[in-house]
Amino acid sequence: MKTLYSPRRFYPVETLFNGTLALAGRDQETTGFAWWAGNARLINLSGKLLGAHVAHAGLIVFWAGAMNLFEVAHFVPEKPMYEQGLILLPHLATLGWGIGPGGEVIDTFPYFVSGVLHLISSAVLGFGGIYHSLLGPETLEESFPFFGYVWKDRNKMTTILGIHLILLGIGAFLLVLKALYFGGVYDTWAPGGGDVRKISNLTLSPSIIFGYLLKSPFGGEGWIVSVDDLEDIIGGHVWLGSICIFGGIWHILTKPFAWARRALVWSGEAYLSYSLAALSVFGFTACCFVWFNNTAYPSEFYGPTGPEASQAQAFTFLVRDQRLGANVGSAQGPTGLGKYLMRSPTGEVIFGGETMRFWDLRAPWLEPLRGPNGLDLSRLKKDIQPWQERRSAEYMTHAPLGSLNSVGGVATEINAVNYVSPRSWLSTSHFVLGFFLFVGHLWHAGRARAAAAGFEKGIDRDLEPVLFMTPLN
């Protein structure tokens, strides 16, 4: 096994600083990596690397279960989820667990069950991680050849890729099954202000599903982030699940083509870099999704989007001033444009004032008031329902603009609530994580390419210039 990586390629960049620290044959001299290089010490020890990965999965699932129970313990049913800093319960609520009409929480027991199940499974993963890290075989190739591998074995690597794809496909179909057969999911667009419903009429048309991928990512187009009905979301999961499963079977049954063998680098570090790149794309996409999309991330649980809070403010004051006798169709604002209503560049009637820049917002509390040419004046005068007024007043004061040390909400809104929106938390964290994963991709891709080319980027530590310089003092 040791012959796969020649010391000439890998070792010169590592600094020996403590030769006495030995870890069961995984010390610095034998691996070329110090203890702080983590799993790099286990590149050729498939059994121990398995232990590290299983233990890592256990930590992830433990966090999910513990945080889930923490949120359940702190949950106050009288306040909206987004005002309580929750990030896990909104996900469970979106899946339809414990939710009634209008996004009201009617039962927290499913949330408790979710937390306990995650804690129990994290214990199983934790024991598995400890076993494979400390007690199990160092390498799997001899005893369990199905689970063993050599990084350079292209056929085995694509088989492992195929297994992963099949598991992802099964995950996508779990959401489909929940939406179709097991109680349904929460639909923020359900009449009267949202409800849990089973999805019966899936969108399976490839022109619609793949049309999202071909949209521009800018402006009102919004790429896949612009999806705004659950039929498309669940239908998209049918497509993606099928593609992942069939792609997985394909990769298990076939060997890489010649062009792929030539174009790709086939080493553990290269696979790490590919994985980091994929996770980076996931992170950036999730960032945009949770910030802009109020269908996959319903505002009842995650709080309004930025544009939604802004439009809600304009709507709330239109309702108030209309009651006080203002003619909202013709009133002029300080700039000479309409104070309450104006026209968009393409002729639709939109809200006036600063919120004009968010004129292409779509939200379930606002859409019933639109006609064929934008906002319908007669509907604004006669058809506004109390639930629309209540919801917009609530969203107006909960804009996702707070920072840790500020009063949340729009700076000009005197009733804004001091909180940080889950949309802010989730989009910011996923942007930052996506960015660092991308940097990690560049780093490991550069190292993997250098090693494949027969040289290693870095300074030869034996001849490092600083060792020959006069001490500063």
From Swiss-Prot:
Binding annotation for [CaMn4O5] cluster: E367
Gene3D superfamilies registered for this protein in UniProt: photosystem ii from thermosynechococcus elongatus (1.10.10.670)
Keywords, comma-separated and alphabetical: Acetylation, Chlorophyll, Chloroplast, Chromophore, Manganese, Membrane, Metal-binding, Phosphoprotein, Photosynthesis, Photosystem II, Plastid, Thylakoid, Transmembrane, Transmembrane helix
SUPFAM superfamilies: Photosystem II antenna protein-like
Subcellular location: Plastid, Chloroplast thylakoid membrane
GO molecular function ontology, one term from the record: metal ion binding
Biological process, per Gene Ontology: photosynthetic electron transport in photosystem II
Chief place of localization: plastid
Membrane-spanning intervals of the chain: 69-93, 134-155, 178-200, 255-275, 291-312, 447-471
Propeptide stretches in the record: 1-14
PTM-bearing positions, type Phosphothreonine: T15
GO CC aspect terms: chloroplast thylakoid membrane; photosystem II
Membrane-related topology note: Multi-pass membrane protein
Residues annotated with N-acetylthreonine modification: T15
Cofactor note: Binds multiple chlorophylls and provides some of the ligands for the Ca-4Mn-5O cluster of the oxygen-evolving complex. It may also provide a ligand for a Cl- that is required for oxygen evolution. PSII binds additional chlorophylls, carotenoids and specific lipids.
InterPro entries recorded: PS_antenna-like, PS_II_antenna-like_sf, PSII_PsbC, PSII_PsbC_sf
Known partners and oligomeric status: PSII is composed of 1 copy each of membrane proteins PsbA, PsbB, PsbC, PsbD, PsbE, PsbF, PsbH, PsbI, PsbJ, PsbK, PsbL, PsbM, PsbT, PsbX, PsbY, PsbZ, Psb30/Ycf12, at least 3 peripheral proteins of the oxygen-evolving complex and a large number of cofactors. It forms dimeric complexes.
UniProt function note: One of the components of the core complex of photosystem II (PSII). It binds chlorophyll and helps catalyze the primary light-induced photochemical processes of PSII. PSII is a light-driven water:plastoquinone oxidoreductase, using light energy to abstract electrons from H(2)O, generating O(2) and a proton gradient subsequently used for ATP formation.
Family: Belongs to the PsbB/PsbC family. PsbC subfamily.
NCBIfam families in the record: psbC
Name of the protein in its database record: Photosystem II CP43 reaction center protein
Organism: Ranunculus macranthus (Large buttercup)
Encoding gene (name): psbC
